[in-house]
């Protein structure tokens, strides 16, 4: 594969029957009627348009051409099933395509594209080997390289994917396409393992790739000191004056040049300090105050249960607030997001609605089960598992967590997690046992409280698949009431937890333990208050510097999509009746 990826623009592949047929013709003009010629060009219409054209035409050759164009656009639109169905229909008429090498070539190309999209690398590679790059139009050649890049991405071979996309960059003239390609390259590099990137090297003459590797190295070295980022990137520009990113900078990096360090002198803290949620607001405020200590920043405190959100926002702004922190309750967050009062002020909401919307100047932070579930998916993938079974209680917590895990798992692996909901924990053991064929590289993410988790663990141990599944779970099962018997029964189970509760010897733990009367749920809220202060003081960094992170009491914090603060949590494991940190 590496040999194929490194071939230059005019390299020829092993001839096949198709290429022999093409080379036997002195000219392809025999096959280029006004419709067939479209195959060699960009396809600008929608898949629906080409499907309709295929249904309307009476000419068999034109029908095939329109179907090929439809498959191409269905792939672009990520409509895998529809693309495969249309391709299957075309396969039944290969005898007609044998009369038209242009259609044969396009058929091979879209077959490879679709195989790569579906993650079938072997089929995609074999099909590409049967295509001669010299016979491709410029539009087709770009798709040829994009398919190679997709194969590399499927294989988690970041450097090869970037190498191919660097080659694509030299072939693009449309600025929109150049921007999309550079954004994709940057996304691959930003999400790659830093150790792997540090050891990667470009080959002789690969200046485009060398430039990308140098740029990501500068970025990663500067991300913790964002104020130095523009100067360091300008230095990179002088080293690579002809690089494609110089003309079309990745979208993420464009924000870096407008970065201004966060400087606070007046903030408004909106919490429920009366009513049913008073106890929650008070412990969060205590964590916030303890983290702030003697900092001179003015903090205006507002009780969201004693006044309307609209009035509070107006008053806070009149009193000079630069930032709104809060509210905590979802209903209040929704009211705030609907207000025009937040259009010209930064906001750190302490909760997120189900469908977080991107709003300029707004970030979302909280101890949501979704954030922890996404962290769980990250952990299973990092530990090398390629298949995940999720068991969750059939309640709001279980459904929210399972759906968030599944969404992240799909992003990480391009496969679906096997989700199973239960009313009684033991119900799900039977279904897993009956459907278990091959559990290699499979892990179980079990969601529930301590009692439910215990039933699941013991049920698995008494089943025919005992010992075949690594078990992971979330912090909900971790309670100060879990004694030695529970910890012994949980042998080998790994669970996520906030850093505060992972280190019982820290001063922060001792303080929170005392304030919360040993209630882990309240201790988590104390930690949230502490991290809220830290986030507020680095608000611009999180908004404008992708990858910026800080270590907090609730996790390693970074900004995800729509400035939704993600938490990379500490992982612990039950071993010999105790709890220990796991790498």
From Swiss-Prot:
GO MF term (any one): enzyme regulator activity
Family annotation (Pfam families): LppC
One Gene Ontology cellular component annotation held by this UniProt entry: periplasmic side of cell outer membrane
Lipidation (N-palmitoyl cysteine): 25
Gene3D superfamilies noted in UniProt: 1.25.40.650, 3.40.50.2300, Tetratricopeptide repeat domain
Keyword presence, Membrane: yes
Database matches in CDD domains: PBP1_YraM_LppC_lipoprotein-like (cd06339)
Its membrane topology: Lipid-anchor
GO terms (BP aspect): peptidoglycan biosynthetic process; regulation of cell shape
Lipid attachment, kind S-diacylglycerol cysteine: 25
Transmembrane segments: none
Keyword check for Lipoprotein: yes
Record localization: Cell outer membrane
UniProt xrefs under SUPFAM superfamilies: Periplasmic binding protein-like I (SSF53822)
Signal peptide feature range: 1-24
Keywords, sorted A to Z: Cell outer membrane, Cell shape, Lipoprotein, Membrane, Palmitate, Peptidoglycan synthesis, Signal
Classification via PANTHER family: PENICILLIN-BINDING PROTEIN ACTIVATOR LPOA
Job description of the protein: Regulator of peptidoglycan synthesis that is essential for the function of penicillin-binding protein 1A (PBP1a).
Subunit structure comment from the entry: Interacts with PBP1a.
Protein family (similarity comment): Belongs to the LpoA family.
Name the record gives this protein: Penicillin-binding protein activator LpoA
Origin organism lineage: Bacteria, Pseudomonadati, Pseudomonadota, Gammaproteobacteria, Pasteurellales
């Amino acid at each position: 594969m590496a040999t194929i990826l490194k071939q230059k623009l005019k390299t020829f592949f092993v001839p096949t029957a198709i290429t022999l047929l093409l080379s036997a013709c002195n000219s392809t003009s025999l096959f280029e009627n006004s419709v067939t010629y479209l195959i060699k060009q960009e396809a600008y219409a929608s898949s629906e348009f080409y499907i309709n054209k295929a249904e309307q035409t009476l000419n068999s050759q034109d029908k095939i051409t329109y179907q090929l164009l439809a498959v191409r656009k269905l792939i672009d639109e990520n409509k895998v099933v529809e693309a495969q169905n249309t391709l299957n229909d075309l396969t039944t008429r290969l005898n007609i395509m044998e009369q038209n090498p242009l259609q044969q070539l396009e058929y091979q190309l879209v077959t490879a594209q679709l195989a790569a999209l579906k993650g079938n690398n072997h089929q995609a590679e074999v099909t590409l080997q049967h295509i001669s790059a010299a016979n491709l139009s410029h539009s087709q050649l770009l798709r040829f390289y994009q398919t190679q890049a997709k194969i590399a991405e499927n294989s988690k071979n970041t450097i090869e994917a970037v190498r191919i996309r660097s080659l694509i960059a030299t072939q693009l003239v449309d600025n929109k396409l150049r921007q999309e390609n550079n954004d994709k390259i940057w996304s691959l590099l930003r999400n790659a393992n830093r150790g792997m990137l540090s050891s990667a090297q470009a080959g002789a003459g690969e200046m485009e790739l060398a430039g990308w590797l140098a740029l990501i190295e500068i970025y990663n070295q500067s991300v913790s000191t964002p104020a130095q980022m523009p100067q360091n990137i300008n230095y990179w520009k002088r080293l690579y004056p002809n690089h494609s990113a110089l003309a079309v900078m990745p979208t993420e990096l464009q924000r870096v040049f407008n970065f201004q360090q966060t400087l606070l002198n007046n903030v408004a803290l909106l919490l429920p300090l009366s009513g049913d949620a008073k106890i929650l607001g008070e412990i969060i405020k205590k964590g916030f105050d303890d983290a702030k200590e003697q900092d001179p920043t003015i903090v205006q405190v507002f009780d969201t249960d004693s006044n309307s959100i609209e009035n509070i926002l107006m008053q806070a702004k009149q009193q000079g607030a630069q930032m709104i922190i809060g509210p905590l309750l979802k209903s209040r967050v929704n009211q705030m997001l609907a207000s025009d009062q937040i259009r010209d002020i930064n906001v750190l909401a302490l909760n997120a609605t189900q469908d977080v919307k991107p709003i300029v100047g707004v970030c979302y932070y909280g101890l949501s089960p979704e954030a922890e579930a996404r962290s769980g998916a990250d952990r299973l993938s990092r530990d090398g598992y390629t298949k995940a079974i999720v068991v969750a209680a059939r309640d709001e917590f279980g459904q929210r967590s399972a759906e968030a895990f599944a969404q992240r798992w799909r992003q990480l692996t391009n496969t679906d997690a096997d989700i199973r909901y239960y009313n009684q924990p033991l119900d799900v053991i039977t279904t897993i046992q009956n459907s278990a064929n091959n559990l290699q590289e499979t892990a179980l993410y079990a969601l529930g409280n301590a009692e439910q988790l215990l039933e699941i663990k013991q049920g698995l141990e008494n089943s025919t698949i005992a010992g075949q599944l690594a078990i992971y779970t979330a912090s909900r099962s971790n309670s100060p009431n879990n004694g030695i018997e529970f910890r012994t029964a949980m042998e080998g189970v790994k669970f996520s937890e906030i850093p505060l509760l992972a280190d019982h010897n820290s001063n922060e733990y001792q303080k929170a333990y005392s304030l919360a009367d040993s209630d882990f749920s309240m201790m988590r809220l104390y930690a949230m208050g502490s991290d809220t202060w830290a986030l507020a003081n680095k608000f611009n960094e999180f908004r404008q510097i992708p990858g910026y992170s800080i270590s907090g009491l609730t996790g390693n914090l970074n900004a995800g999509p729509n400035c939704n603060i993600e938490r990379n949590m500490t992982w612990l494991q039950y071993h010999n009746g105790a709890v220990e940190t796991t790498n």
